[in-house]
Structures are given as C-alpha cells and as structure tokens.
C-alpha cells in the first residue's frame, strides 16, 4: 500500500498547524476560580437511580476547569469559589447543578436517567418512533456529529456513516459534485437512486446538497421493506428522510457558524516529462519521430515555443478557497415556535475558471392554537455555477488530458497565442486540444432557483386521535446561457493562422419543474392494559410537470452580445413538456405488548400515471416483528446486557422510474414529409408502446438484532437481508424489421438478487473530565442477475448476463505479456498457434487466453473478468474530549473491488502518459510491468487494465475547543464560542496510482474531475 498524501508539503503544514492549535487553545483557558480568594470545600456522594454509587462521575465548578471525579464509593471533594455553582454529570444521566453556599457544602446527589437518551426517537415514514420500538432496519445520523465537515455538498457528510449505504464521489467539480448513493446494492438495470424526502416532501439527492448542514437535525435511512413499504412504488431503492431543525419554547437564540477552507486535488496524475513522452511517441510512430536534435531541445529547454515541457494537469488545477457563513435564529413561546436561517456559500473550483455560489434561506414555523396545531415550512436557494463551455467529464476537458494534449506543446507561445503545435512538423495541430484555451474560451452562465413550501394543520380530535393535512408546493428552475465565440483562430509560434474564423453561437436553455402534493393522515394511539396500539391511515396525491425549452442562434456581430436578437442565422428552437401524477392510500399498525413483543404492519396502494390502465394500481404490504428479550423476567440478572432485541421483517416494494410515457404511443413533430415538391410539417411515431408493462417489484427479507452492553456504553446492530427484484423493465432485442429506426419497447423480463449483511458497533464512556468514543461499521453485498430470459446485454466493456452481477466487466482475460520466443510460439489445447486478430503477436504485447479455443484472439474470446461491487465497505471513528477540548477522526474505505485503469497504447492523438509507462516492455527492459507502446491489440479492454481499487481514507479530522460561559464572553452576550480546525481526505492508502480510487465503475478511462482534499478553520458562536 502507498500512503499518498502524508508526504505532501501542504499536508505537513496543516498538521503542524493542528498541533499548534492543540497546545495554544488550552493555554488560553485560565480558570476563573484561580482569581477568587475565598474558597469553600464541598464534599458529597453521587448515586444512580437505584441508589448504587456512581464511579467516575464528573464534578466541575461551572464556568471553570476546576473539577474532580467520584471515587469507587461515589464520594468526591472539591474546593470551589464562594457563590459558585457545581455541575455533576455522568453518561446516561441528566446533568445536575447545585449552588454552593455556607449552608450547602455537603451534597447527597441522586442522578436521574436522561429521558432523551431513554426515549431516543428515530424519524420513520410519516412519523417518529422510539428507537427501542423499531422493528425494521433503520439507520440514522445525528448531524451534530458531522456539521463541521468542510464539504461543498452536504450529502457527502453521509459517506461511511450508515452501514449498507454506499456513497461514491465521482469527482468534485464545483457545483457538479452530487454523489451516487446506493442502498443495499443495485436492484435494477436503470434508476437505482433512493427516494429522498426533506421534511416529508419528496426531493432528490442533489437537493440535499443545497441544505446547510447547520439546518439539519437528523437523517434516517429506511433500508428494509418493513420500514420503507409505507412509500410503496418509490421505495425499492431505499428511502432517505431528512429532518430540518425547528424552534422550541425558549428565549431567542442566535447562532452563527462560519468557515474558510482551502481545497486541492486529492491526487493528480504523475505525467512523464516531454523528453520521455517524445521517446514513447517515437516507439509508436517511427515515421513521425522526433529527431535527436528535437530530443536534445526537449531535454535542455532551449526552445520552449517549439519544444516545451508542460505539465497540463498542474496548469488546469489549482489550490482554491471555499467559505460559508450561516446565521440562524430559533426560539418561541408556548404558542409559537420558530427557526429561521440563512446561508451564503462561495466555492472557487480547483479546476481553473470554475466556481459555485449559493444563497439559502429556511423558515420553519409552528403555532399551537388550543387543539389545533399549524405549521409553515418555507425554503429556497439560488445557485450560480461558473463552468467552461466545453464539458469537463466524459469526452470533455478530462479526456483532453489523457488523449489530446502532449507535454511538448506550451500553454501559450511567447507571442501570446494558445499553443497547438510543437516543433515536430509531422504532427498535425488538428489532433491537439488545448484545455487552457477551452477553459477561457466563451461564456457559460448556469443558474438554479429553488423554492419549497409546505403548510400543514393538525387537530386533536380526542385523546390519542389526530388528523393532519398538508399541502406542499415545489418549484425548481434551471437557466443556462452558453456563448461560443467566433474568435477562436489557432496560430503557430510564428503567428501564422492555422484555422479560419468560425461562427459564434448563443444557446439558451430553460428547465422548469413544479410539483403539488396533498397528504391527509389520521393517527390513533391507545392502550388496553399491556397492549399498546398505534394506527395510521392516509391518502396522498401529487402531480408534477416538467417543461424544457432550448433556443440557439448564430452569426452575432461581435463576441460580446449575449442576446438572442443579436444573431442573424441558423435559428433553432426545441421544446417539450411532460406530466405525471401519483395517488396513494396507505396505512400502518404498530402493536406493543408489555414492552417485549412488537409487531408492525404496513400497506400502500399506489396508482401511477406512468403505468397503463390495466396495471396502474398495485399494493405493497410489509410485516415485521421484534422481541425485546431483556425486558423478560428471566433476563433481569444478566447485568452486563443492557438491552437485546431480535428483529425480522418481510415486505414488498415497487419501482416506477421508467419515464412518463413508456406504455403509450407518443408522437414527435417532423419536417421531413414531402407533399409535392416541398417539405411539410407532420407527425411521426416516437417509440413503440407496450400496454402490458407493470411495476418492477422488490421483496426484502431481513433478520437482525440490536444489543447494548454495560449500561449502554457499547451498542451493536447486525442485519442479514435478501432483496429480490422481479419484473425488471428492460428493452429486449427485437428484429429490426419490426422496430424500424425505433428503440425496442420496455418489457418486464429481468430478475436480480442482492444478498448481504451489515454490522455496526459503537462505544462511549466518560470518566470525569475525559470522554471517549469509538465505533465501526462493516457491510457486504453480493449482486446477481437471476433471470434475463436468456438475453445478454453487452455495452462497451460491461455485460448484464444471468448468473453475473449487474454491469460486470466484460473483456479479454489477460494472462501476461509476451516476453520470449516460447511465448510467441504458444499453442492452444488443439495444438494451434495462437494469433491475435489473425496476426502474429509481437514481443511486449499483452497475452490473452483463447477462451473459444480456436487459435485466434478476438471479441469472441471476451468473458466476464470481474464486477464493480466491493466485497466489503467499512468505516471507523475514534475521538476523545478533555474538558472543552475535543479531537475526532473518521475513516472510510472499501475492500475487494477492481476498477478500470485503462490507457491508450498507440498515442494516436497524442495524450499525456503517466509514469507507470516508464516501466514498459522494451528490448532493454524485457521484464517491464507495462506492455509495449504501439499495436492496437493492447488497447483491448481486458483484465490487464483492472486495478485493485481498495482504499482506506481519513475522511475527516476535527480538532476543536469550546469556550463556555466565560466572563469575557458573557459580557458580550455570548453563550458559547467554538473554534475548530478540520480536514477531509487528508490521508489515503491505496494501490491505485495517479487517480483517486473513489470513483464509479463506469469511469474506465479516468475522465472524471478529481476529488478534493480540504483544510478548514471554523467558528461557531451562540448568543
């Protein structure tokens, strides 16, 4: 394993700063008691709720660092200042405060259990439940633990925090860094994103990014059918519930949090210099070779205009700043509660000429008017994204690096023009693309506007019986203006024009999405003896409309006109609109017998406009139960076991994500119909319908347990599950005579199984001024296609095939490199000499297995060579605090996974080469780890290019100090002040060189924007 980041100078600087911070802040903590002349000696004993002595309870003079801990008998002695207050605390119990006077110097303290910990609740579908009463598999994140992470996208804070939830950052381009989230594997061939609800309103993963972390109270993930089936047809991929903060009955509290951060790429490719690159090019193209004189100039740098040494990755990327400022006010009376917040966020991208700016606001209001409760949630955001007119990923700027640039060309010539040629006259400028020119050429303004509103009313009809009705409205608009200039003539180093003036073009894109949601829910809670019941019945209806419009025009007089009326030629306008609606009836029954036996039943009946009338409605039930063993009498004497709950569940879910009109015969306008001698506008069939399609259905079986040991200091959760998806909608191959030029229609044909396990454990303890915590999570899943009606779906380097995982890697099986004559003379089982594409292989070529045993390596020898699913994902956290000083670390990683690290071996269009190619095969280096350069046979997708993608990453490190109730702060009206240093992705251990190991399996060519490493300083102030 290679430790990639520790040796970087910037990291050393930051770690040094962290150490200085550790020693400097505690030194500022001058005890207020040291300034007091009069002292009282206080003594006492601390007992728990059962009368047993509490060992290690913290006894601290409030507002100071003067403190002690109770001994083995629960006793303590402490000298304090006159007229002071002491605070006594212990894990699992509520803090207690005592005012010290001459008449109150001996204390007998009985701690009371912390009811918030006992009654810890978790947000579930359409409500909350006590954690101890959950029968399904629900994981939750308290955002107090992660809110200070210096990330641009709030969703990234969830990475590694939830077992069974895999979050992958596929690049960190400013404004385009929404991660991929998969819950318990991949269940279908398309559309595997989970359902997301923010304060009960359906949203998306990308919208989580727009919520300031300081606004979020908690995030719950519903992983099994028992917990998710209440959402029916949208819940097959799991459900993420985001709950924002609300006000309470308290005086107004103003909170400010701000941070400033520096970002840099986690890793940039280690490209060879121009001299080494030119030698590689000569091996591939001897007819276009760099001469000895040219090579000499590349070595000595004597002619930088014609023989440069450019590191294009370092020219494209930079260290960039990021800062955010969040202000909130919350409070309320008995009748009215409020929480109002706003945030400003500014990020300069590490890719030059990119940036992301966002403004957010949120207002959550609650009013209690007798038996009626009213609420109003309002939130909105405005986001401006600066980006180049050329795309960054895919075939954009990142592809330029790997395929179309070479280090022998300068960024700019000395005459100021962008570089496109070097001094080798045999290489055309047409194969070169200058990414720095692309970053600076043209104009692109990408604006996003979002507004969400929800009004709800709730009435207490009678004891335990409530009715709640809500109306929500969602508005999202995206406007993109792109201008490509005409003044993009290419020149050589002497100023000669290589191309002519082009035609400029302005494109305006407009997208609008609006949604209305109405929900009506009736709940009834009642008990009969030891029998407790909770009933829920509801109805929901929602409608969504999407509008898209795009217009473009060319022929503008100058490159400074960004209005459509300024164009003179090639008008082009397109537009479309779609609508969908969903109606649902749902219900839930919770039964609790004596706090020991739990039963839950859910059912949802969904009707979707996306399905044909014959299959428009479907029902999705679930059943779950649990046994809390530790509430049984026979477990009373098992002292070390605080709680033990066994769980089991089964349920059915659905998936409607196939587009809005998959079953219908849609039409499209066309101007290609002739009547007489002229073309006329007409209508044509856009796709072939299938009125027999129905829901994709997922059933999940889950067994697990939740256990707590030694008074709740250690908590363990385990789950085993099997998730089977059937009737998967896919496009089966059909005869071309039937399809014509259209795609095949969707049919219900596939089946997929995901079988996996999850384990999580956490430990927390406290002794006096010291507290520490540790935890870990492990999970694994095996994905398998169990039925595809005998059809195979091959796409580039992946395949969907029965018995294999979705998106399995498909290519030739590499068994080495031809290094000797004996290798060249190898034969197959039939004694045939093995050719490659009917040609004799050469020394240095990659050697492939002859799968079909016909003596010739070609596409027929492709086979499954791996799959994109890791065998295990894991995380662990370690942290401690001493008085007001705290340190927390969080590590995350995956194991047992392979990623493509493919590279073009012919250098046909130029393209930078990484340093691994310095160890390529050659006559002077016959044992090289890389094949020879040149020869298209080595370009084949094969297992040779699969690299172990395991990694372990220090995802977050935070060191902080909190000033509480200091005299100098109290005078300023400050309740508390926290200063902290934090970093993300500080260390990475991996065997994958040159590229970040945290990437999607679909990134076979390393065309993705790098991820970022971040260093930040932050402050939290509460008034």
Say what each PLM segment does.
Residues 146, 186, 193, 320-323, ...:
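Extracellular/periplasmic, surface-exposed regions of secreted and cell-surface proteins
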Residues 242, 855-860, 959, 1019:
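Residue-level detector of buried hydrophobic side-chain packing
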Residues 264, 268-294, 381-426, 482-484, ...:
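A surface-exposed, glycine/aromatic-enriched loop/edge motif typical of exported proteins
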Residues 46, 61, 69, 195, ...:
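Hydrophobic beta-strand positions
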Residues 1-362, 366-368, 372-381, 392-393, ...:
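Short, small/polar-rich motifs associated with maturation and membrane association
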Residues 286, 298, 303, 484-492, ...:
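Surface-exposed, extracytoplasmic segments of Gram-negative outer-membrane nutrient-acquisition systems
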């Amino acid at each position: 394993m290679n430790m990639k980041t520790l040796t970087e100078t910037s990291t050393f600087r930051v770690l040094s700063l962290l150490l200085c911070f550790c020693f400097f802040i505690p030194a500022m903590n001058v005890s207020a008691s040291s300034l007091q002349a009069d002292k009282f000696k206080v003594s006492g004993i601390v007992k728990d709720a059962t009368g047993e002595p509490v060992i290690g309870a913290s006894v601290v003079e409030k507002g100071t660092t003067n403190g002690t801990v109770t001994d083995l008998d629960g006793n303590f002695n402490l000298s304090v200042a006159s007229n002071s207050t002491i605070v006594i605390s212990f894990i699992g119990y509520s803090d207690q405060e005592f005012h010290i006077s001459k008449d109150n110097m001996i204390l007998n303290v009985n701690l009371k259990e912390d009811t918030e910990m006992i009654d810890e609740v978790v947000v579930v579908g359409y409500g909350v439940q006590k954690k101890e009463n959950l029968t399904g598999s629900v994981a939750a994140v308290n955002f107090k633990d992660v809110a200070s992470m210096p990330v641009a996208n709030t969703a990234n804070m969830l990475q590694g925090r939830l077992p069974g939830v895999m979050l992958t950052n596929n690049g960190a381009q400013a404004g385009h860094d929404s991660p991929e989230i998969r819950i318990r594997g991949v269940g279908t061939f398309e559309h595997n994103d989970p359902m997301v609800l923010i304060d009960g309103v359906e949203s998306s993963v990308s919208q989580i990014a727009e919520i300031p972390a300081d606004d979020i109270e908690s995030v719950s993930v519903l992983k099994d059918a028992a917990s998710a089936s209440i959402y029916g047809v949208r819940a097959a991929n799991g459900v993420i519930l985001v709950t924002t903060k609300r006000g309470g009955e308290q005086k107004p509290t103003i909170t400010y949090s701000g941070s400033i951060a520096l970002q840099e790429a986690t890793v940039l490719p280690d490209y060879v210099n121009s001299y080494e690159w030119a030698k590689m090019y000569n091996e591939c193209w001897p007819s276009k070779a760099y001469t000895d004189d040219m090579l000499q100039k590349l070595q000595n740098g004597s002619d930088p205009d014609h023989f440069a040494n450019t590191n294009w990755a370092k020219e494209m990327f930079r260290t960039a700043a990021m800062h955010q400022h969040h202000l909130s006010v919350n409070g309320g009376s008995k009748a009215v509660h409020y929480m109002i917040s706003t945030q400003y966020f500014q990020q300069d991208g590490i890719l030059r000429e990119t940036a992301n700016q966002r403004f957010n606001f949120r207002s959550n209001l609650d009013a209690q008017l007798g038996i009626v409760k009213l609420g109003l949630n309002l939130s909105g955001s405005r986001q401006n994204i600066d980006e180049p007119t050329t795309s960054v990923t895919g075939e954009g700027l990142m592809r330029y690096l790997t395929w179309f640039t070479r280090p022998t060309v300068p960024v700019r010539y000395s005459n100021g023009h962008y570089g496109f040629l070097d001094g080798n006259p045999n290489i055309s400028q047409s194969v070169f693309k200058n990414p720095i020119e692309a970053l600076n050429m043209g104009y692109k303004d990408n604006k996003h506007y979002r507004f969400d509103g929800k009004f709800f009313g709730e009435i207490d009809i009678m004891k335990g019986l409530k009715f709640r009705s809500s109306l929500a409205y969602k508005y999202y608009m995206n406007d993109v203006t792109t201008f490509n200039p005409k003044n993009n003539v290419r020149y050589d180093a002497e100023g000669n024009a290589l191309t002519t003036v082009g035609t400029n073009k302005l494109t305006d894109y407009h997208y609008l999405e609006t949604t209305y949601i109405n929900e009506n829910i009736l709940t009834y809670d009642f008990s009969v003896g030891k029998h407790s019941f909770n009933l829920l019945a509801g109805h929901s209806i929602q409608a969504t409309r999407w509008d898209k419009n795009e217009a473009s025009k060319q022929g503008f007089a100058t490159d400074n006109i960004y209005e459509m009326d300024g164009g003179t030629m090639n008008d082009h306008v397109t537009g479309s609109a779609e609508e969908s609606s969903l109606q649902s009836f749902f219900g839930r029954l919770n039964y609790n017998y004596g706090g020991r036996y739990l039963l839950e039943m859910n059912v949802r009946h969904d009707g979707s406009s996306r399905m044909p009338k014959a299959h428009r409605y479907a029902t999705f039930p679930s059943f779950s139960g649990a046994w809390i063993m530790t509430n049984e009498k026979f477990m009373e004497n098992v002292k070390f076991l605080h709680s033990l709950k066994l769980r089991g569940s089964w349920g059915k879910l659905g998936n409607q994500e196939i587009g809005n009109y998959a079953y219908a015969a849609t039409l499209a306008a066309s101007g290609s119909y002739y009547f007489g001698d002229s073309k006329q506008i007409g209508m044509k069939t856009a796709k072939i319908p299938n009125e027999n399609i129905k829901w994709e259905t997922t059933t999940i079986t889950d067994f697990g347990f939740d256990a707590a040991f030694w008074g709740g200091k250690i908590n363990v959760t385990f789950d085993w599950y099997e998730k089977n998806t059937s009737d998967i909608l896919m496009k089966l191959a059909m005869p071309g005579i039937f399809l014509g030029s259209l795609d095949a229609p969707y049919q219900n044909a596939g089946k997929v199984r995901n079988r996996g396990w999850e384990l999580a454990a956490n430990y927390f303890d406290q002794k006096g001024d010291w507290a520490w915590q540790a935890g870990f999570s492990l999970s694994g899943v095996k994905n398998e296609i169990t039925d595809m009606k005998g059809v195979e779906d091959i796409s580039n380097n992946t395949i969907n095939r029965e018995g294999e995982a979705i998106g399995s890697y498909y290519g030739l099986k590499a068994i080495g490199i031809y290094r000797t004559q004996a290798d060249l003379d190898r034969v197959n089982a039939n004694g045939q000499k093995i050719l490659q594409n009917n040609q004799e292989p050469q020394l240095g070529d990659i050697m492939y297995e002859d799968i079909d045993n016909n003596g010739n390596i070609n596409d027929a020898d492709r086979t499954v060579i791996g799959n994109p699913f890791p065998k295990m994902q894991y995380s662990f956290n370690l942290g401690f605090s001493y008085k007001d000083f705290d340190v927390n670390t969080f590590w995350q990683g995956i194991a047992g996974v392979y990623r493509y690290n493919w590279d073009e071996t012919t250098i046909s269009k130029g393209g930078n080469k990484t340093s691994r190619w310095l160890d390529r095969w050659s006559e002077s280096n016959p044992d090289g780890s890389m094949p020879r350069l040149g020869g298209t046979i080595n370009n084949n997708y094969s297992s040779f290019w699969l690299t172990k993608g395991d990694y372990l990453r220090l995802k977050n490190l935070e060191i902080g100090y909190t000033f509480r109730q200091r005299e100098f702060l109290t005078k300023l009206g400050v309740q508390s002040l926290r200063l902290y240093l934090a970093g993300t992705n500080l260390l990475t251990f991996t065997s994958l060189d040159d590229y970040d190991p945290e990437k999607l399996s679909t990134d076979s060519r390393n065309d993705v924007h790098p991820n970022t490493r971040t260093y930040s300083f932050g402050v939290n102030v509460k008034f």
